[in-house]
Amino acid sequence: MLMLLASHEQDIAEMKITKNGRVVSKQQDNREVGLRHYMKDHYPAIKIINLELPIDGTRQQYDNMLEQFFTGHPNIHHCITLGSKAHVMGDFLLRTNRREVQIMGYDMVKKNAECLRQGSISFLIAQHAYQQGYCSVDALFKAVVLKKKIQPVNYMPIELLTPENVNFYRRTQL
């Protein structure tokens, strides 16, 4: 979805939340592998510029790092965050009145939703956490209690949330 907007760019940013220089979740790591593979296959001329923010950073540290990043990369207009902290950049963009940067983020957490409504995040990928949790417990019950064979892979739906449809997202729907 981001590439519909950024296909003409030379560079895009990827914001990562890290601890000791490593991403903090396996999901975030897997998403990055998928992103880089997709970009290599479909947009090989576009360079991904990394921005690493420490998980235990303060707002002031984030502001300093983001200011330095955007000053050093004035042609960055699109950013993807592969974890649930898109709001860190979204808040910064709102406070510094940078309207030319579009963010794609993950996870429908409250702070991300607020930034989406205010326009500093362009869209979010929501993954129906309640449904995932239900399916996980259901599979565990079937495997352990009922001794049934379960499928090792369970594909789940995602939703693309925008400022126009975010208020209709049914977070707790099974």
Predicted regions and their residues:
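Hydrophobic alpha-helical
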Residues: 54-111
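Short beta-strand segments enriched in small/hydrophobic residues
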Residues: 10-23
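Short beta-strand elements at the ligand-binding edges of bilobed clamshell
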Residues: 1-4, 118-130
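Glycine-rich, charge-decorated loop segments at or immediately adjacent to ligand/cofactor-binding or catalytic sites
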Residues: 110-119
